[in-house]
Amino acid sequence: MFGLPKREAHNKGRIGLTIASDHLALAIVNHVRGQAILTRCEVLPVDAAAGPGAQAAVLRAAELPRLPVSSVLSADDYKLALVEAPDVPPAEMRAAMRWRLKDALDFKVEDAVIDVFDVPPPSRGGQGRMMYAVAARRSAVERSAAALLSMPTFDVVDVPELCLGNLAAAVPESARGVALLRVGETSGMVVLVRGKTFYFARQMDLKVASRAAGVSDRNGQLDCPNILLELQRSLDYYERQFDQPPITRLVIAPAGPLADALAENLSRDTGFDVSVLDLNSLLNCTTPLVPATQAACLLAVGAAMRQERRSL
C-alpha cells in the first residue's frame, strides 16, 4: 500500500505488525515452494508508560529475522473510497485522487498520504474504470515509521482490507469466490475475492444488539439483520458490476463466541457455506494457534502474507 523507500531484505517472506499503545501483534510468514508457512505469531506486550521508544525496544528484543516488514493502519487512521479513476497518467494518479477525495475526509487533505489500488474493470462497456483510493492520516503513517525505526527492512504501511484480502485468497474455495467478514462490537468489514483477485470491500457501521434492544442471549449479541443487509448489498454489487457468478462461500474472521454466533445466524439465514476461519487449517503453522491469538493477530498475519512490494 503506502510504500517506503526500498530496503534490501533477503528470503521469501514478510513480517506483519499491528501497533497499539500497549502491545504489538506480530506474524512472520515464509513462502517455501509455493506454500505459506506461519513461523511465528504472537502478541508482544508494550509498557505504554515507558515512552515513545518502548515499541522499538520490544521489537529489538524480539530478535526478528531480516525480512520485509508491513505495518497495518487502524480503522480510525484512514479513509477508503471506491471512485472512478481520473483520466491521468499513472505518475499523476495520487495527486488527482487527493483533490477528488478532499470533500470526503474528516481531516485536511493536505494532511493525507494518498495511495490507490485497482479492481477489475466493470463487465459492461461504457462504464468508467474504478479503483480504490486510500487517504491515510500522515501522522499515523509517521507514527508507524517512528515505531519501526529500528527495522531497516520496513517498507509498507498496509490497510486492513488488503490484509483480509490476502487471507481470503488463501481459502481453498477462493477460485469460485469467497467473502471474508470481520466484525467487532461496533464495526465490521467484508471483502470479496475470486482467486487471487481483490474485487470489493465494504466497511460496516454496526451496533451491539444488547444495547439497542436489551438482547443478551448468545445468538443476539450482534445486529445480524444489519450485517446480513450489508453483506447482501456487497454481493449484489459484485455480481452486477463484474458479471460474476454468486458467491456462496462465507468465512467469518475469528472473534471468539461473537464469530461462532454470527456464523450460526448467517448459515441459517442465507443457506451459504459458512465457517469461522481457522489459521491452523488455512496455513502451515509451526505452532498451533489458540483462537484468542488468531483474533488478536489476524491482520498481522494478513499483512505478512503480502507478496507484492508496491501497488502502483
Residue ranges, per PLM feature:
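Hydrophobic/aromatic-enriched cytosolic interaction surfaces used to assemble or bind macromolecules
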Residues: 1-312
